[in-house]
């Protein structure tokens, strides 16, 4: 399909022994580079890593040889109970040590570098003593992992917590970025005159997110950019204009960086 540079799947949707889903994925992987995106490792959780889950993930990686694997800075399991969500972590030294240890173990078992994604958040913790960007930088420094810059997550969190998304992008360590995500978000009314933004992946990408993508590419150079659409998915033909817009932004950055070099 013209305009499709690579595809990405949620790894947990394909952790079965066989069946049509894996056969279809074999066909996709023959045509396009494949990226795996995890949603359940619970890297920020206090529980030990689920080694059975990691084993299934390793089998998937060995079968499809993805160009990258990414996971979220979040937790989803506690005391053996799995919560079907990506929940926020406290940015303190204890969490940093725990996340770094979990990433190191994950990378050793999988035999590949992990890309850690900045989260979308809806609450903050008074006890946090690290800034999010600095926390991500330090985690990468300690583990050798890369980063996945989710531009929509930046926009969502910045709106919800009242800071500048452009300043966040400006401070981000772009040399560590292996992939960029963009997506749509939902705006839900809360108190009178206020809204909370939700990382919904079921609506078109907003102009504010497109502008942040342009900023990120200008600062860090071309990177693989994924258009995420998990809900209310339209026909592929309806998404092609967005893919063309991504390609144009990457092409312009190639020229700009060639001139600067």
Where are these regions (language model features)?
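N-terminal ordered "arm"
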Residues: 1-15
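Acidic-and-aromatic substrate-binding clefts and catalytic sites of carbohydrate-active enzymes
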Residues: 11-23, 42-52, 122-129, 155-162, ...
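Gly/Pro-rich active-site loop or hairpin
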Residues: 18, 48, 86-90, 96, ...
């Amino acid at each position: 399909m013209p305009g499709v540079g690579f595809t990405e799947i949620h790894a947990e949707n394909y952790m079965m022994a066989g069946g049509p889903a894996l056969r279809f994925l074999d066909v996709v992987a023959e045509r396009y580079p494949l990226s795996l995106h995890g949603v359940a490792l619970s890297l920020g959780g206090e529980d030990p890593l689920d080694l059975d889950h990691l084993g299934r993930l390793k089998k998937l990686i060995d079968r499809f040889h993805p160009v990258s694997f990414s996971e979220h800075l979040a937790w989803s399991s506690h005391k053996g109970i799995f919560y079907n969500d990506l929940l926020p972590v406290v940015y303190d030294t204890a969490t940093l040590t725990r996340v770094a240890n979990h990433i190191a173990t994950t990378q050793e078992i999988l035999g590949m570098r992990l890309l850690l994604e900045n989260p979308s958040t809806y609450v903050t913790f008074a006890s946090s003593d690290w800034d999010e960007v600095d926390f991500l930088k330090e985690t990468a420094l300690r583990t050798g992992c890369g980063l996945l810059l989710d531009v929509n997550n930046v926009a969502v969190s910045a709106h919800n917590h009242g800071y500048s998304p452009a300043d966040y992008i400006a401070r981000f360590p772009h040399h560590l970025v292996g992939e960029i995500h963009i997506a749509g978000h939902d705006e839900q009314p809360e108190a009178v005159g206020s809204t909370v933004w939700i990382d919904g992946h079921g609506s078109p990408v907003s102009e504010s997110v497109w502008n942040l993508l342009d900023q990120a590419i200008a600062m860090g150079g071309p990177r693989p950019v994924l258009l995420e659409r998990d809900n209310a998915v339209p026909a592929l033909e309806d998404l092609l204009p967005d893919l063309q817009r991504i390609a144009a932004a990457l092409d312009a950055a190639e020229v700009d960086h060639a001139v600067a070099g």
